[in-house]
Design a protein with these regions (language model features):
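Glycine/tyrosine- and acidic-biased, solvent-exposed loop/turn segments at the edges of beta-strands
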Residues: 1-233
Length: 233
């Protein structure tokens, strides 16, 4: 369809309201300009996978500043957040059509900084949660089972690298168990152990050096009997 537009200029620069309409008369865009820069409230009707109404504000310097929203045509929010001097700042939340929260992010000066949580669409079950600093994972990281919401993975990051303990649930056709590894600056280094979920008995133990198994390793049955003992070199 044909898009009709209305633009205003002053001294060769866009100034005042800029409007665009679809051929059926639907307002597609209402932007405000001052001396060639976008200022104040900017409204856009976005057509895509979802049709959305987007509203963003610009300051006198022509930078995004203040609340941001994109809203489904039926009125529920898709994304809510805010800008400060052209950069994302504070909490940003993404929603599903159903109204369920899909993602929560925290920003500081345009970089992800703080808690990040994602949820499964439909069930609302927490999928992942972790902390960011300067756009990199930093601190506790967790993943959950989408069926029952239980923890299935846990680790610690430092400046975007695994650093410290990592726990992983291994689902087996016999007995499920937790593996606990140790990381230093992104490499597996130090003690490793696996414990049965059912009774917390030791299943396996040994050591890693630079991502490889080294030294004496042992494996046990669920009732605590030594099943196997071997050396890794």
């Amino acid at each position: 369809g044909k898009v009709e537009s209305e633009r205003n200029f002053r001294m060769g620069k866009e100034h005042g309201k800029q409007l665009s309409y679809d051929s059926d008369g639907t307002l597609r865009k209402e932007h405000n300009y001052k001396d060639g820069k976008q200022v104040g409230k900017q409204y856009t009707f976005l057509k895509g996978t979802y049709d959305l109404y987007e509203t963003v504000y610009f300051n006198e310097e022509g930078l995004q500043d203040g609340e941001y929203s994109s809203v489904f045509t039926f009125g529920s929010p898709r994304i809510l957040g805010s800008y400060k001097n052209g950069k994302k700042n504070g909490r940003w939340t993404t929603f599903a059509e159903s109204g369920d929260t899909l993602m929560i992010e925290t920003y500081l000066d345009g970089k992800e900084d703080g808690l990040h949580v994602s949820f499964a669409n439909g069930s609302g079950v927490r999928q992942k949660e972790y902390y960011m600093k300067n756009d990199r994972k930093d601190g506790l990281y967790r993943e959950y089972n989408l069926e029952n919401g239980e923890l299935r993975y846990e680790a610690t990051y430092q400046a975007g690298r695994l650093h410290g303990k990592e726990r992983r649930l291994i689902v087996s056709n016999r007995f499920d168990y937790w593996e606990t590894s140790t990381y230093v600056n992104g490499r597996q280094n130090g003690p490793f152990e696996a414990r049965y979920v059912k009774n917390d008995q030791l299943r396996e133990c040994g050591e890693y050096k630079n991502g490889r198994r080294v030294g004496r390793w042992k494996r046990y049955t669920i009732d605590g009997k030594l099943e196997k003992e071997w050396d890794e070199n």
